[in-house]
Amino acid sequence: MASPAPAFSLANLLNGSYGVDTPEDVERLRSEQREEAAAACRNYRPLPAVDVSESVTEDAHSLRTPDGAPAEAVSDEFVTYGAEDYLEKSDDELLVAFETMVKPMRIGQLWCPAFNKCSFISSIAMARALLLAPRTSNRTMKCFEDLVAAIYTKSDFYYGEECEADDVQMDISSRDVPGYSFEPWSRTSGFEPPPICEACDMIMYQCPCFDFNALKKSCAERTFADDYVIEGLDGVVDNATLLSNLGPFLVPVKCQYENCPTPTLAIPPDLNRATDRVDINLVQSICDSTLPTHSNYDDSFHQVFVESADYSIDLDHVRLRQSDLIAKIPDSGHMIPVLNTGSGHKRVGTTKEVLTAIKKRNADVPELGDSVNLSRLSKAVAERFFISYINGNSLASSNFVNVVSNFHDYMEKWKSSGLSYDDLPDLHAENLQFYDHMIKSDVKPVVSDTLNIDRPVPATITYHKKSITSQFSPLFTALFERFQRCLRERIILPVGKISSLEMAGFDVKNKHCLEIDLSKFDKSQGEFHLLIQEHILNGLGCPAPITKWWCDFHRFSYIRDRRAGVGMPISFQRRTGDAFTYFGNTIVTMAEFAWCYDTDQFEKLLFSGDDSLGFSLLPPVGDPSKFTTLFNMEAKVMEPAVPYICSKFLLSDEFGNTFSVPDPLREVQRLGTKKIPYSDNDEFLFAHFMSFVDRLKFLDRMSQSCIDQLSIFFELKYKKSGEEAALMLGAFKKYTANFQSYKELYYSDRRQCELINSFCSTEFRVERVNSNKQRKKYGIERRCNDKRRTPTGSYGGGEEAETKISQAESTGTRSQKSQRESAFKSQTVPLPTVLSSRWFGTDRVEPPCERGGVTRA
């Protein structure tokens, strides 16, 4: 009789008597389980009397659940032996059971999966519970041993659809290997019949003609593939392929090779060059995705809308003179780009267009600065400038050079424009406060997505005549060269022959960048900036009278646009076209930067006009608010900062050298420019092509590392995909290769009449009929056969100058005429008459004048 279970108490809990099953309890639980199993069998299928002491058959697949679904077999293993029985077994017995149920893979002395006693017994208990639980799924659950293995390895408890419970061998043919099919091969006993010699009918091993050394050598060269039968194999299969296909079971298979489908290649094999993948449609798609508002932009009639619509503007002290406007000189037309990149047409300097440009570029000067002591603070800023940038020893040992030679170079440069030494005026007799004004006909490319809501305004140029500029430019050019020689080593001005953006031994990677964007830079400069540059010019060695004189006629000036009839006074703002524009903007930017930031924290500093860029190992520390409160500038610190200056990215190659790369976004916009004049021999288009090649000479240095840098910097600056920048480089490489590729980007809207003769050339006759129609020119009646020239004087009533044709000229003319006639008669092949209906330039490779049999009408 079973003893009652011990009561719960602290003593029974500590001595281990509470919670431990006695042998009687174990026997009682087993009896109850046997009764439950027998009752289930009696309820769902009539069974003969079964002795509960006997084990239920292992393969009892005929049990049925109440809903008619087949149930799993009630195995003797989980009825007779529970988790408690395995706890009583020794470690060796558990290892045998683990190897029988889980079937681990042996790798040397290791098992995979590794044996864990607790996990193994827990898996047995869970498998026992799952088999007794009611079935809720139509899938076939694994048998007890496989279920224990599935729980232990954390795999599926059910058999797959292609596998049955009694067949768990892997179907090798079901593997998806392209081009190969595998079928199971029957195992062989490994016995090989000995080879029989045909000559002596003896076993080759005993035959005197048997070469044992050759057989030994051949057996030594046997590989894994020689141990398996491979039939119908047309391709080449190596050992690695066989191992991956056979798997860990190493079952002999029959391998059969089939033809693989033709692979789909993103790049056709015949396109072996990177530029072959680039066409005009790809470049246009890049523009559409990168510049979404530019692809549909067309400003062909924007200026017409401005001129014909009502116009309202608020300006002070403006003088309009509409009586002597200069009419627009008609040009010969411009080439039309194939790409639509948002480039605008050339702006005409009409009155409304000039007033709009003056309103934005010259008028409405911002007043953001505080009230300061100009004389004292300007000297302090100039002193900080020399301490931060100038090498005192170099400045003391340097002097002016090449002033006269610079003057002669300037005169030679503009000699073709009519500038001569005799035309140079006396500067003391000239009013230097008067400046000419004009607008730039070319609008700067817009990189922001605002063309759908904002019309770009052209920039303005305020300039002196060349005769005045020629006398100041040589002096400031020599002074700027001296200024470059006196700079510290870490200061770089990317201009001229002395310095550029090429920096050897300097890597821009792993550096902190600082880029300050100064808006409205020219018109925001006031008297404070004029005093600063006056002190700096005196410190650099410019003669004090010239400095004083130069600054005096920049305090108050008057600008006038003769073509538009507009004039207005201006004060201290920068003149955008005089001899000191770039030099003055550069030293003002450097002075402001030195006052707002400590320049000693930077490894490299680059300045060019109103652009600035600094590199440092640590994050830069400074007060950029002084740009606004002290220097009256609208300043913005670019975040995230990238190495970008003068519309160029700075990249470093594998050798640690830095070079500049033009902004791909601006360059791809220039491919759609609308300012190239038309010419019959494409001379203007070729000039633009050479300029394009010169700007993109960096392409030969672009390695994959540099392309990755450019993609990252492009994404950080424009928040656009860096892959587009890499595609732009491929387009640049194609269109810089030769001029014929570049000509695909433009065409002309001039309709050319191409007349091709359809009759024999020997029947062609040209007859000139003397016309009685009279022509009048400068008041003189002339007939078409009159050999007299028009008057050479400036007035229409001048005397006629008779023209005598020399005998040599007439002889040369007759010889040229005979040569043309003989060349024309040599063409005996009749050609059909074709009138071209397409625009000239869209599909041409060479001009019509170079095609045979084409005559322009």
Swiss-Prot record:
* The keyword Transferase is assigned to this record: yes
* TM regions (residue ranges): none
- E.C. number: 2.7.7.48
Give the main EC class: transferase
Region (Disordered) location: 782-829
List all Polar residues biased stretches.
Answer: 804-816
Do the record's keywords include RNA-binding? no
Which InterPro entries does the annotation name? Bromoviridae_RdRp, DNA/RNA_pol_sf, RNA-dep_RNA_pol_alsuvir, RNA-dir_pol_PSvirus
| Domain RdRp catalytic: from-to ranges | 511-624
User: What does this chain do?
Assistant: RNA-dependent RNA polymerase which replicates the viral genome composed of 3 RNA segments, RNA1, RNA2 and RNA3.
Q: Which family does it belong to?
A: Belongs to the ssRNA positive-strand viruses RNA-directed RNA polymerase family.
Question: Which protein are we looking at?
Answer: RNA-directed RNA polymerase 2a
UniProt source species: Cucumber mosaic virus (strain Kor)
